[in-house]
Amino acid sequence: MGRLMIAVLLCVMISQGFCSGVFELKLQEFLNKKGVTGNANCCKGSAAEGHQCECKTFFRICLKHYQANVSPDPPCTYGGAVTPVLGSNSFQVPESFPDSSFTNPIPFAFGFTWPGTFSLIIEALHTDSTDDLSTENPDRLISRMTTQRHLTVGEEWSQDLQVGGRTELKYSYRFVCDEHYYGEGCSVFCRPRDDTFGHFTCGERGEIICNSGWKGQYCTEPICLPGCDEDHGFCDKPGECKCRVGFSGKYCDDCIRYPGCLHGTCQQPWQCNCQEGWGGLFCNQDLNYCTHHKPCQNGATCTNTGQGSYTCSCRPGFTGDSCEIEVNECSGSPCRNGGSCTDLENTYSCTCPPGFYGRNCELSAMTCADGPCFNGGHCADNPEGGYFCQCPMGYAGFNCEKKIDHCSSNPCSNDAQCLDLVDSYLCQCPEGFTGTHCEDNIDECATYPCQNGGTCQDGLSDYTCTCPPGYTGKNCTSAVNKCLHNPCHNGATCHEMDNRYVCACIPGYGGRNCQFLLPENPQGQAIVEGADKRYSYEEDDGGFPWTAVCAGIILVLLVLIGGSVFVIYIRLKLQQRSQQIDSHSEIETMNNLTNNRSREKDLSVSIIGATQVKNINKKVDFQSDGDKNGFKSRYSLVDYNLVHELKQEDLGKEDSERSEATKCEPLDSDSEEKHRNHLKSDSSERKRTESLCKDTKYQSVFVLSEEKDECIIATEV
């Protein structure tokens, strides 16, 4: 019943455009002679002598599904309505009303199959104001009338009269199908159409009736011209016959011969089968006399025996060179005893006089005394001679010798066995069929064998149930064991309950199937997961272990962030160390060069950046400029213009001085060693560079780096 109510409520919510029928309630007459409510109070005014109670009556209608005990409470599963004030104490309900929102009869549209039963509640209520039509106040109730009925679909109105303690209500009702809906429950939809998708009208029960010239399930197949070849012809509209390629004719039953074929025929398109007496590719060559002149008559066969000669093979009953003479089989008078002979083609027939019979009337006739009638036939003498037999039912023939076989026309359908009776026949139907000729398939689904919401599919002498989830068996009566396939993991125990399963997890696991490893749980706590939520025998933990998952994600993020910070720190340290090494190496190189040259010349220059250089194309007094600049650095300034004057023998002196300088100021030993090896191994490169610098008219200045010697042009800033 609960499922029925849910289905009904859903159907009531469907748009009115999808209705299949309408329940109509027509209010006709209401009597409330005293003008009182249900609690015997006067609606309005005073019940004192000489005064009349006056009510303003309106109605509340509630249409429900069939209930053994009708309840007036909501919901009104089939629909509800509240009328405006229709009258006073006693009145007849008009069919029209100024308020266009109310019509009489009152319609209740259905969007589903009419079940055939209903429950109806009609409440008459009083109001002080026509604008106040609330129905919650029980003091307004004048009367309540309830009924439940069976109702078939039809145009005829059913009358009813409800009599209460002080009131009477006369009304009528019916259920009619919407347009294009048919059947007992208005569940058959059929809309006539005459377009590409069908050409049909609808019968009284909603069956499709094809228009003239159309056939098929939905009348979409045109009926071609009668006689149109089914294989070689077709049609797009009724009454026509279009030929397929290779065929022609009114009925498309003539094949098209090979182009140019003159005296030939075809069995298939594009053939040229020569007629007798003709040959060649196009059957245009005359081969014999028989073909030219056709001398043989009366259907005889002509055979060429040479040029200008032939032989005719005559059909029975004919003779002569050209079979032109018909043979008379009666010429020998074969009929005896006065029988009359009739010449036929290659035979004859004798018409015997009374009292004789046989092919040549050679046999004398029998009488009833000879008992000529068989199978219980009644013999009667013929006044003109001879006899005749009156055959019983089921027999025929001159002597009732033939038994009439009523099964000879194969009247039984669907491989049923036909039994020939005396004057009729009987069809023994195979399983699954019924009817006089076994033409009707028995609907095994008519008894609704499928249980628990299963869908029934009718077959031949059988049916098939498509079960909903959770049920199995021939009739869907067996519930499926949810624990059959061991859905629970990690040693959990499966319990079946309420058409579902519940997993009792061992400590440390969770999830519907105990598939998740959880953070450590309190001692002895077992977790159970069901179809709807996860349970714990001691405390509900809220379902999926989000805390554990979130904690794991946060931990991973912290590790990644810490690792990134550590990598960045290491890279910065390595970069600072590399810069310090490069700086120490450059300073050491400049100091070494300064020490070597300061012993010969006491000169100093300012070291300037490449971006600050200004070329003035003249020689510069580095000694005076150095004094002017007045740099007081821990490193002696170098006159790079004098570097090219260094001799090869000065290199050894430079090495010894560098070792002494190292004692005073520690440098990176690796950078020092690289520079010493570079000076010793690249002497040839240095000589080439010195030569290049000598030729530079701007008195170029260069520094010997770790990688290679370069010329740097120094100019005044």
Swiss-Prot record:
Cellular compartment(s): Membrane
Organism: Danio rerio (Zebrafish)
InterPro entries, A to Z: DSL, EGF-like_Ca-bd_dom, EGF-like_CS, EGF-like_dom, EGF-type_Asp/Asn_hydroxyl_site, EGF_Ca-bd_CS, Growth_fac_rcpt_cys_sf, Notch_ligand_N
Positions of the EGF-like domain: 220-253, 257-284, 286-324, 326-362, 364-401, 403-439, 441-477, 479-515
Region (Disordered), start-end ranges: 649-693
Membrane topology term: Single-pass type I membrane protein
Keyword Calcium carried by entry: yes
Residues with attached carbohydrate: 475
Subunit: Interacts with mib.
Keywords recorded for this protein, A-Z: Calcium, Developmental protein, Differentiation, Disulfide bond, EGF-like domain, Glycoprotein, Membrane, Neurogenesis, Notch signaling pathway, Repeat, Signal, Transmembrane, Transmembrane helix, Ubl conjugation
S-S bonds: 177-186, 190-202, 210-219, 224-235, 228-241, 243-252, 261-266, 274-283, 290-302, 296-312, 314-323, 330-341, 335-350, 352-361, 368-379, 373-389, 391-400, 407-418, 412-427, 429-438, 445-456, 450-465, 467-476, 483-494, 488-503, 505-514
Leader sequence segment: 1-19
Protein purpose: Acts as a ligand for Notch receptors and is involved in primary neurogenesis and somitogenesis. Can activate Notch receptors, thereby playing a key role in lateral inhibition, a process that prevents the immediate neighbors of each nascent neural cell from simultaneously embarking on neural differentiation. Required in somite segmentation to keep the oscillations of neighboring presomitic mesoderm cells synchronized.
Main subcellular localisation: membrane
Span of domain DSL: 175-219
PANTHER family: CYTOCHROME C OXIDASE POLYPEPTIDE VIC-2, UNINFLATABLE, ISOFORM C
SUPFAM superfamilies for the chain: EGF/Laminin, Growth factor receptor domain
Protein's name according to its UniProt entry: Delta-like protein D
Gene Ontology BP annotations: anterior/posterior pattern specification; cilium assembly; determination of left/right asymmetry in lateral mesoderm; determination of left/right symmetry; determination of liver left/right asymmetry; determination of pancreatic left/right asymmetry; digestive tract morphogenesis; hematopoietic progenitor cell differentiation
Tissues and organs where the protein is expressed, per its UniProt entry: Expressed in both mesodermal and neuroectodermal regions. In the developing nervous system, it is expressed in overlapping regions with deltaB (dlb) and deltaA (dla); in the neural plate, dld is expressed in patches of contiguous cells with dla, while dlb is confined to scattered cells within those patches that will differentiate as neurons. In somites, it marks the anterior part of each formed somite, while deltaC (dlc) marks the posterior part. In 24 hours embryos, expressed in the hindbrain in stripes adjacent to rhombomere boundaries, but not in the actual boundary cells.
Pfam families in UniProt: DSL, EGF, EGF_DL_JAG, hEGF, MNNL
Post-translational modification (record): Ubiquitinated by mib, leading to its endocytosis and subsequent degradation.
